[in-house]
Amino acid sequence: MDDNKRPLYLPFAGPAILEAPLINKGSAFSEEERIFFNLEGLVPYAIETIEEQASRAYDQFRSFNNDLDKHIYLRNIQDTNETLFYRLVQNHISEMMPIIYTPTVGLACERFSKNYRRNRGLFISYPNKDRIDDILNNSTRQKVKIIVVTDGERILGLGDQGIGGMGIPIGKLSLYTSCGGISPAYTLPITLDVGTDNPQLLEDPMYMGWRHPRIGGEEYAEFIEAFMQAVHVRWPDTLIQFEDFAQKNAMPILERYKERYCCFNDDIQGTAAVTVGSLLAACKAAGTELNKQRVAFLGAGSAGCGIAEAIVAQMVSEGISDEQARSQVCMVDRWGLLLDNMPNLLPFQQKLAQKCADISHWNNFSDNISLLDVVNNVKPTVLIGVSGAPGLFTEEIVRAMHSHCERPIIFPLSNPTSRVEATPKDILHWTSGQALVATGSPFEPVVVDGETYEIAQCNNSFIFPGIGLGVLASGARHVSDAMLMASSRALAECSPLAINGSGPLLPKLEDIHSVSKHIAFAVGKVAIEQGLSLPASDELLMQSIEDNFWKPEYRRYKRTSF
C-alpha cells in the first residue's frame, strides 16, 4: 500500500501540529481532523487542496522583486509546511531551482546571520566537542538516512562563510527531496562550527557562530573523528555527504572515511560524476569516444583533480592504459601546467602532473606554462573550468581551441555565475555556435545566427539525488567508485542530444524524477553486484526505488492516545 494512502497516527494536537513543518497542512486539514486534533478556529474556515495552497504561494513568490527575497520566502514555507514547499518546487522546478540553490544560495550564505529566522538542522560547535552525542540526540529527526555536512570553509566560490555555510546543506537536502524523492523526514543538514578565518565575520556583531580563528591540525582531525563516530552510533545506516570543505581537508577526509562509513564528497565525486556523464553525452553527440579526447583543466584543486581522475578511470574502462589516459589530461592552475618537477604539489595533484620530458619540445616552453600554451601545443578537444576565477576562458583561448577542433567541448563549471570562466553566449559566438557547452550555474538560451542553443547546466543535482536514492533503495554500505561511474553512464543515457541528435546536452529539470530513478537503479545494481548490499533482483530493486520515492502529498491523520 502506498504510504501516502496510509493514515498517520499522531500523539499530539492543537498548535503543536501547526508548528511541526513535517506534518502541518495549514488550511488543508479536513473537517474531521480539525475536530479530532483541536484545530478549529486555529486555521481559516475554508478547507483547501494542496494545489490551491500552492497556487496562492506561487502568486506570493512572484510578488517579490529580487532572488534573495524569493529565497527567504521559500525557506519560510519550508520551515512551516514542508509538503507544500516541495509541491510548490515540484510544480516550478526550473524557475525555483536557482532560487533554492545556486546561484541564490551563495548570497543567502553570505547574509545567513543577518537573515536568520528559524532553526533548521544542527550546529555542532567545537567548544561543544564533548557533547556531540547529546547534540545529535536533540534532533527532531529520528530516522535520519541522509546527512549533508559542511564546515563552511569553501562555500561555492565565495570562500569562508563560517556557519553561514549552513545554507548549502539545507539547499542540497532540498534537492535530494525535490529531485530524488528522499522524504524530508529522513534528511538532516549539519554545520560543523570550527571557527572562521573570515575577518568580516569575526568583526560582525551579528555573526552567530563561534568567534574564533579556525582550528586545524590534530584538533580538527579529532573533532571530525568524534563527529563521524557519533553519527554512526546514532544513525548507523545513514549516508553522509561532505560538502564545501576546503581543499586541504576535503580529500584527506574522504580518503579517511570512505571505506569505514557510507559517505562521499559531492564537490569531488559528485562533480566528477556529473561532468563525466555530460562528457560521455557530448562525445556521443559528436560521434566520438571519451578515450580519444585531449582534456585541459583550468583549476587543479580537489574538485578539478577529482573530475580528472574520473575521466582517467572512464578512459581506461574504454580500453586505453592508465599512463596513456593521464598523458591526455592536462591540469593548469595559477602556477601554470602541473609538472612532475614542481616541489609543492599536493598528493592528489602528483598523479596528474605531466612529465617534463614529454613537453620539452613544446613551443614557448617555460617554467610557467599558461592555459593558452597548453591549448596551442596539446590542441585539446575538451576544456573544463573549475578555477572559481571569472573570465579566464578568453576569446583568444577559445578561438585557438576552435581552430583545431570543429566541435570543442567547453565546460565553464565554476559557481556562482559571477565566477564563471566564460559565459555561454561568448563561447558560442566565438565558435560560431559549434561548441558543446555546459555550465555549473543556470544560463539563459543563446541565439547565434538565428539558431537557439539551450545551455545544459552541468549541475550535481542531476547526480547526487539519484546516488542517494540508489543507496537507500539498495541498502548499500558504502559508495564505491564503480557506483559513481555507473551514475555517470546512466546520466549520459538520458541526454536528449545524444539520443536524438538534437536538443540540450542534459535532460530538462522537469524530467529529473525519471533521471534520478534511472541513476538510482544503475547505482543500486552495482552495489548489489559488488556485495555492498543484500542480493536483490532487478524487479525488487526497481520496486524498492519506487517505495522509497516520496511524493509531496498530504496524508490522512488519525489521533492516538496522548
From Swiss-Prot:
Co-factor binding comment: Divalent metal cations. Prefers magnesium or manganese.
Sites marked Important for activity: 267
UniProt cross-references to SMART domains, sorted A to Z: malic, Malic_M
InterPro entries: Aminoacid_DH-like_N_sf (IPR046346), Malic_enzyme_CS (IPR015884), Malic_N_dom (IPR012301), Malic_N_dom_sf (IPR037062), Malic_NAD-bd (IPR012302), Malic_OxRdtase (IPR001891), NAD(P)-bd_dom_sf (IPR036291), NAD_malic_enz_proteobac (IPR023667)
Recorded catalytic activity of this chain's protein: (S)-malate + NAD(+) = pyruvate + CO2 + NADH; oxaloacetate + H(+) = pyruvate + CO2
Catalytic center residues: 101, 172
Entry GO MF terms: malate dehydrogenase (decarboxylating) (NAD+) activity; metal ion binding; NAD binding; oxaloacetate decarboxylase activity
Top-level taxon: Bacteria
Enzyme Commission designation: 1.1.1.38
Entry's transmembrane regions: none
Cofactor: Mg(2+); Mn(2+)
Coiled-coil regions listed: none
Binding site for NAD(+): 154, 267, 415
GO process annotations (BP): malate metabolic process
Residues the entry annotates as binding a divalent metal cation: 243-244, 267
One GO cellular component term: cytosol
UniProt KW keywords: Metal-binding, NAD, Oxidoreductase
Subunit structure: Homotetramer.
Protein family: Belongs to the malic enzymes family.
Protein name, per record: NAD-dependent malic enzyme
The organism's taxonomic lineage, starting at the top: Bacteria, Pseudomonadati, Pseudomonadota, Gammaproteobacteria, Alteromonadales
